[in-house]
Each structure stands twice: as C-alpha cells, then as structure tokens.
Amino acid sequence: MYDNMSTMVYIKEEKLENVTQDEIISKTKQVIQGLEALKNEHNSILQSLLETLKCLKKDDESNLVEEKSSMIRKSLEMLELGLSEAQVMMALSNHLNAVESEKQNVRAQVRRLCQENQWLRDELANTQQKLQKSEQSVAQLEEEKKHLEFMNQLKKYDDDISPSEDKDSDSSKEPLDDLFPNDEDEPGQGIQHSDSSAAAARQGYEIPARLRTLHNLVIQYASQGRYEVAVPSCKQALEDLEKTSGHDHPDVATMLNILALVYRDQNKYKDAANLLNDALAIREKTLGRDHPAVAATLNNLAVLYGKRGKYKEAEPLCKRALEIREKVLGKDHPDVAKQLNNLALLCQNQGKYEEVEYYYQRALGIYQTKLGPDRTPNVAKTKNNLASCYLKQGKFKQAETLYKEILTRAHEAEFGSVDDENKPIWMHAEEREECKGKQKDGSAFGEYGGWYKACKVDSPTVTTTLKNLGALYRRQGKFEAAETLEEAAMRSRKQGLDNVHKQRVAEVLNDPESMEKRRSRESLNMDVVKYESGPDGGEEA
C-alpha cells in the first residue's frame, strides 16, 4: 500500500515538473475561482445555519446546528488560507514575469554595452594609431620646418619675383656645373658667366651639349613634379656614362650634380649631399682641386649642409669655394662677392656677427668697384644684408644710415635727383613725424607732399628696407614715420604682385610654350645658392 502511494506521489511530482508556468497560472486561476465559489457557498450555508439556530431552542438539534456552523467556519478559514496562498502564487508569478522581463532587458543592454565597448576599443586603437602617426608627422614637420627656414634664407626671392628681374633671367646662360645657380639676375650677367666658363675651359673641361639638354629636361620635369620620370632618366644616363667613360670622369660628376638637383627638389638632402660628395671627389681627381667646377660643387654642398642645419660643417666648404674663386677669378670679381655673401649668412646663422660684417663690407666694396654706380641691385641687397647685421649687433645708427641710402638711391633711380621738391620717402616720413597733429587743412597724409609716389618703386629689396626702417623708427618711438613706411611697403608689395600676375596671365594667353620655359627657369632661380635671408636678401628687423 505504501509502495503504491509513493509511486503515485512520484508520478504526480513528475507531472508537476512537466507542467509549464503558463499552465500553473491557468490552473491557479481556476482554483481561485473554485475556492471563491466554495467560500460564497459556505458563507450562505453559515448564514442559513445561524438563522436556523436563532429559531431553535437549546436542545440536541441546536447543538447539532452549532457543530455544523463550527465546521463551516473551519472550512471557511481553510478556504481563506487557500485563496491567500493562490493569490501569493499569482503575485509571485507576476513578480517572476517582471524579473524575467527585466532580465531580458538587462541582457539586451549588456549585449549593446559589449558592442559599444568593442566599438570604443576599435576607436581607441585607431586613435592611438593616428596619434602615433601624428607624432611622427610632427617630428618630420619640425625637421622640414628647420629646412624651410634655411631655404627661405637661400632663396633670392619668394614667389613674388620682380617682373623686371624675371625679364633679365636667361637659363641658357647658367653654368651647368652649378647645381643651384648662385648668380643673381642682373645686367652684365652674361659677362660674368662667360668669365666663369672661360676659366673652366682654360682648365680643360667643357660640359657636353647632350648633358646640358638632359639638364634642361630634368629641370622641366622637376618643375612639373614629375620625379618618377626625372629620377629614372638621370639614373639611366649616369649608368650609361659610367659604362662608357668609367666612374671617375667629369661627365659622371656633372650627371651626379643633376641627380642631386632632383633629390634636392624632393627634400632628400642627405641623398643629394652624398651625390655631391661623390661628384666633388671625382672633380678634384680629374679637374684638380682649384677648378671652378670644384668651387661650384663645394658651394652647393655647403648649401645642402645648411638646409640640414649643419652650419658649422658648411662654413669650411664655403670658405674653400671662396679661396678657389679668388684664385681663379681674382679677389675683386663679382662671383667672389656672391660667395662672400654666402659665407656671411653662414656666419650669421652661427652668431659670428663680426665676421658677417667683414664679409658683407668686402662684398659691398667689390660690387661698388666692379659694377659701377651705387644703384645696382646687388649693391642694394648687400647694403640691406649689412644693415641687418648691424641690427643684430645693436648698431642701429649704422643700420639706419644704410637703409636711408638704399631708399634714396631707389628714389633717384625712379624720380631723379633729390631736392626740396623731390624727396625720398624716408624724408617725408620724418617730416610727418615732426609735423604730426599740425596739419592745417586736416588732409590725409596719403595725399600730402607727394610722398606716396615713391610706392611706385616695387623692388623687393626696397619693400624689405621700408619694413626694416619702419621697425627701427618704432624702436625709436617715431610711430608716425613708421606707419608711413609700412603703408608704403604694403602698397609696393601689392603693386608688385599685381604686375607679376598680369605679366604671367599675358604670357599664358600669348605663348603657353614660353610660359612653360619661364617656369623651368623660375624653378632654377628660386633655389639659388645664396644664404641671404628674406625674400630679397635682407633679414627683416
């Protein structure tokens, strides 16, 4: 019997385990309904018994009714208990459903957070990579900045090249053995080139025409940014020359110079310097240590060292180039003056201002002696450089004197001799300083005294001189005079830019082929071997 009962209980438990939660809820609701019905029925019976009990006297029958009433009350209590338990089960079920729903929501939120976490990890990894690349770029840009600062000092002009100087330039006259031509565009340039070329010819080497042609092609490709054509062309020509003439041949050295030019344009200064060192060794071996081509290579090598900030290493190379040019051309040759300018700026970058002053003064003496009047561009540029050197040393009076000389010569070249009615702009500026606040008619100084006409002089050297002298006036507290010169410099620069733009537009419209050739020459001229700082060879105060 007990075995049968245990088996029945086990079967019932197994059945309960197989019942789903929804079925349990449904059956519980049915049980609640049944219990409610029983409760109502028992209440009715109890009321009936109580009414009956009131009508009966105390006897056996009334005792029986009381006993039945007591049983009904117990049944009602059990029904109440069953209803309470059923309601608790329903509440528990609702709570479990809510918990399950919350659980699903939490799981969904966890999945979303996991996805967001993965996305943030990916973003962090990408950001770290970008940061690393940015740091590398910053380091590279710092190096490039140093190079560009020095290149700015090497350039004869910036992109605002004077139209009159553009007109005088002639790339066909540039000596090919100078990787970066260091001769400035000026009258008499052809004579200087012929002197240099003649000196080279007397010492037994002349650059073949085919290499000159290749050089011009490479310059054209480089100006167009087509290095993928220029570099293989140079390397192939170099390989052919080494096969036919051997490595130690002047033509090979020339080809190395041309390839170094391309590397220089790509900012590969170290590779370009290696090529120039090789070219220098070949030229010293084949042409002799005192050949003009050796001087040119030394000069170009000094420039590349300078672009890398190695001024100390560049200085002896520049000095040796100066010695060779003095020996070959004479100590008073204009090319020697140019080399002195280069050497002066190298010393300036090292803070050797006494040597800078000496080199600039000597170069100025050569220019004034050999190039004639005091109005040549080289004289003005060298005076500007010397004035900048004076500023560095605190010799403000000497600098002011030179700046005034430059402006006076420029004014005379444009408007004739100076007199009471025809004064250079610095005189008008000082008059304005003396008379500030005293104009009787209240007219703007832009129309006063005719000083604004000096703005027609659009030489970059004059523009820089105006800025520097204006800064010097400010240092002296002459603010009205400074504003006069600064306004003139601004007008001069704007007029120069407008003229250059008009000329280039006209060239493109009239002769595109000529324009392309001019660009090729311009790319050469913009990288002249000289260490003058600023767009026109003078460092602004």
From Swiss-Prot:
GO terms for biological process: axo-dendritic transport; cell adhesion; microtubule-based movement; stress granule disassembly. The modification Phosphotyrosine is found at Y448. The modification Phosphoserine is found at S162, S459, S520, S523. Gene3D superfamilies: Tetratricopeptide repeat domain. TPR repeats lie at residues 211-244, 253-286, 295-328, 337-370, 380-413, 463-496. Oligomeric complex composed of two heavy chains and two light chains. Interacts with SPAG9. Interacts with ATCAY; may link mitochondria to KLC1 and regulate mitochondria localization into neuron projections. Interacts (via TPR repeats) with TOR1A; the interaction associates TOR1A with the kinesin oligomeric complex. Interacts with BORCS5. Interacts with MAPK8IP3/JIP3 and NTRK2/TRKB; interaction with NTRK2/TRKB is mediated by MAPK8IP3/JIP3. Interacts with CLSTN1; phosphorylation at Ser-459 inhibits interaction with CLSTN1. This is Kinesin light chain 1.
